[in-house]
Amino acid sequence: MQNYFQLLELPQEYNIDLKILEKQYFAMQIKYHPDKAKTVQEKEQNLIIATELNKAYSTLKDALKRAEYMLLLQNINLNDEKIRSLLSPLELSIFWNEMERIENTILFSDLEKIKHKYELMQQQNINSLKQAFEKRNLSDATIHTSKLKYIRTLQNKLQEKIKSCK
């Protein structure tokens, strides 16, 4: 498996330009499209590359997946147990309280307010991640990635609740 940044010919940094990512992805998809192959072997090879390009693009375009991938490149694998150990008891308590808050909220307008709050939390955390990766501070990057993962869990739970209210 080739490094996703190298595959898409991008600098290996967290703060990537998503428009350039998309442009590179589509250019590479055209270049390695299986239908452009002249031989069966070439077609098979292009199919493998196209599949890797899809994985690379879906990973790098998502802030959380990109952070997890960059940590993985540094041999830091964030499993659920490790993530829980990175957050303080207070942070975990806040997370569970937020889960209960979502569960107990009835009004759609209140759910929208919560959604806005989580979007702000996510953006602040992404900004912290950018700084941590720029400074090559893997400890902070790991902590902020775990926080972002919790925020994403809250956002997913909230989306389910909003759908059930419609």
From Swiss-Prot:
Record has Chaperone as a keyword: yes
Family, similarity comment: Belongs to the HscB family.
Gene name of this polypeptide: hscB
Organism: Rickettsia typhi (strain ATCC VR-144 / Wilmington)
Domain J span(s) in chain numbering: 3-73
Keywords: Chaperone
Upper taxonomic lineage: Bacteria, Pseudomonadati, Pseudomonadota, Alphaproteobacteria, Rickettsiales
NCBIfam families noted in UniProt: hscB (TIGR00714)
Complex and partners: Interacts with HscA and stimulates its ATPase activity.
Domain of life: Bacteria
Name of the protein: Co-chaperone protein HscB homolog
A molecular-function term among this protein's GO annotations: ATPase activator activity
PROSITE patterns in the cross-refs: DNAJ_2
A GO BP entry: [2Fe-2S] cluster assembly
Known function: Co-chaperone involved in the maturation of iron-sulfur cluster-containing proteins. Seems to help targeting proteins to be folded toward HscA.
